[in-house]
């Protein structure tokens, strides 16, 4: 088995790091990989030579279907194309509409399987493959960790974000705002469910083709609900006297008055974020809107020896046990989160036990290398 893996660009090269670990998984299972990195100024020439020359390959692999974004390049693909999505499919609508055969897609949320089948029926194979995590060789012992609570992630002010909709024509603005507001309370609904509900209330019927376009056009809703809960969680902690070290872009827009407790730092590189996790007792996670999926931050937190405290997803509840390998909190009961955090800060040995169990479980089952092995097994099975 031979494959071509294309490494694109991303903020802090984070996707490149994930891909390099996935490649190790491919190679462990005996697959020969030709890697083409966009960081190489001659990457297009190398790609063209590989696709049109005598190099024999069985599949092409990349993250988020990036190569499908080239208008003509995909027409030269001679074998199966595998796109590993790390976001909701609506962010990659135009790429997913390409008609290459065979076209394989993996997704990080089980809800997205039904979404892809419904709106992109031309896709040949679809599989749920969750994120993985990355650890370090050396991490600090739990009792010696200097950071009590760590939060990593960017910030957008949800109030200001919603004000942006005032520029939008009235009917569409009401649809967007009403969908955002229903997701604030229906925390287990997907964006698609909420939007379909609002369309039904307006007696508007959409074809699947129209709906996939609308979802792609209204990613604002997904961005808003992520921003809303990120703000709510951090604000609630500050108001209740929980000290949090926050790293990420945009937090200068946070208008809370809890500067004694919410300590805002500049954004850091991905590798620096791993070092911070290795110095933290608790790493707080607010899931992207993946109701049956995963996020790499959960696994990476565990692999770096911190206690992961995260809101729930159906998948995470399937693979981890609450208060054994991680600690869940509920978006509907964010007011209980300060007490939950304080409970584990006060019980150092209990927190350490959960952190170690999570580390062991994630290192065994949830590395990016492991995902590479799972992916290759699937590609071979479907050949």
Cite the ranges covered by each PLM segment.
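Catalytic binding pocket for nucleotide-activated donors in carbohydrate/polymer assembly enzymes
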Residues: 4-11, 17-30, 34-39, 98-99, ...
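Nucleotide-sugar donor-binding catalytic core of glycosyltransferases
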Residues: 8-18, 120, 124-291, 313-315
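N-terminal beta-loop-helix "entrance" segment that forms/cooperates
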Residues: 41-54, 256-257
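Short N-terminal targeting/anchoring amphipathic segment
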Residues: 51-66
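Structural motif
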Residues: 58-61, 80, 104, 282
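Short, polar loop motifs at secondary-structure junctions
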Residues: 64-69, 88-91, 109-113, 134, ...
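Active-site proximal beta-strand in glycosyltransferases
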Residues: 74-88, 104-107, 131, 150
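A conserved, positively charged/aromatic
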Residues: 93-106, 119
